[in-house]
């Protein structure tokens, strides 16, 4: 019950109800984008600080496993979606890539929940978040290139597309900043990036609830396949 009454969940429910009731409630797009940037960089900074205090050797095996998992899940999802014959190739690749990677906001919600329940987790989880994103996107790009007969695309273009994307760039940048400064040396930003994090996350989930309610109708088109 405590988990259900978490403010993050309640804000999502409020947004979903507002959307279903056709309310004009919306988080302004410019502010929504700002919140997205804030959450991504905050996740990165927190992860960098936690990584600074963890044993680097203990991260190697989980990173390798995560990289393999990103490739396997993306290809498996693409295979399953193709077998349903309900999706165009481009749509199947896009959906499979999303399944293979991970939502940074979903990650933030889960971390917030674990902290509220006093459940411990490994310090390097933010690093794995980035590692899971990279192979999934690369696999998705390669699948799309092969599907469109553009398999000869330069590997440099693929790498650029992956690492210069907003999510990866901000999280990796945040990891570097967090690892460099450490928690005790950066108290001047703790309030903004740490103390206010859950409040901004609630506003983000409010908009996510609205968006989700508007996309429920899409289930009628694809059924329960997803």
What are these regions (language model features)?
Residues 1-19, 26-30, 56-196, 200-208, ...:
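Alpha-helical transmembrane segments of multi-pass small-molecule/ion transporters
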Residues 25-26, 37, 51-52, 201-203, ...:
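A generic structured-segment signal
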Residues 34-36, 42:
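Metallocofactor- and cofactor-centric catalytic cores in central/energy metabolism, strongly enriched
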Residues 41-56:
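Active-site-flanking structural segment that lines cofactor/substrate pockets
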Residues 211-226:
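A beta-strand-loop signature enriched in Asp, Gly, Thr, and Trp
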